[in-house]
């Protein structure tokens, strides 16, 4: 796989493709992704983690921002609580293979005078409506937002500037914030970042992934629980909006070279696949039973997540 193909695989959008190709010609290129510290790291987080590993392997200098101050502003806990979660998250990410990169705690630079002045300068230029719209996909209780939540996207823009990165990675829900950065940072003599967006995956029940619904798999989940959750997962005969196939595409094949469907000879015997595309095609033709697919995905996930479970002990 060439460098460009590795960078764009499993993405939904790059803004812009021309700028990305130009960036890949540079000897030094830097990218970042930010994470609000969370009590559970799950498959939703793993989409960007997998992409950061791709970017690292493609020659990017990778920075992970552990956004403790952002989490505090977004009502996720006290500063003390979110700092503890940030350290736990770092250990999870390292256990998932996100090593040989830089981890930065947001509060280590976001309280500096230089950073705060940039935030205030940007806030002068951006209307309240633009700030609120940019937060609609990522904020809590946005029908009645706090002033701190309006500062959140402006801080994210300042992060891109202060970290000195060429590209920003995030879920497609970050798009509006990233577009603000592309529009306004050049006016403050900072380059417009290349923006790389990955999809927001469905929960295992086919609905929006949510901690309150428990429709996700944590990276620290037991083998038994992974099998139970995957067995109950929504897996329609169609390819579209199939959460089990999404796990296969975005989590299994980026990390494993092959996946084997194990079944008795009377049902066709074992069959090994070397790519997601090959497996999706076979499933669409009815050559793989949903129950067999779910079993294979569960066992593959157990293999992939074993190192992080061991690392966290």
Curated annotation (Swiss-Prot):
It catalyses: tRNA(Tyr) + L-tyrosine + ATP = L-tyrosyl-tRNA(Tyr) + AMP + diphosphate + H(+). Pfam families: tRNA-synt_1b. L-tyrosine binds at residues 32, 152, 156, 159, 174. A motif ('HIGH' region) lies at residues 37-45. Keywords: Aminoacyl-tRNA synthetase, ATP-binding, Cytoplasm, Ligase, Nucleotide-binding, Protein biosynthesis. Coiled coil: none annotated. One of its GO terms (cellular component) is cytoplasm. InterPro entries: aa-tRNA-synth_I_CS, aa-tRNA-synth_Ic, Rossmann-like_a/b/a_fold, Tyr-tRNA-ligase, Tyr-tRNA-ligase_3, Tyr-tRNA-ligase_arc/euk-type, Tyr-tRNA_synthase. One of its GO terms (biological process) is tyrosyl-tRNA aminoacylation. Its EC number is 6.1.1.1. Catalyzes the attachment of tyrosine to tRNA(Tyr) in a two-step reaction: tyrosine is first activated by ATP to form Tyr-AMP and then transferred to the acceptor end of tRNA(Tyr). This is Tyrosine--tRNA ligase. It comes from Methanospirillum hungatei JF-1 (strain ATCC 27890 / DSM 864 / NBRC 100397 / JF-1). The lineage of its organism: Archaea, Methanobacteriati, Methanobacteriota, Stenosarchaea group, Methanomicrobia.
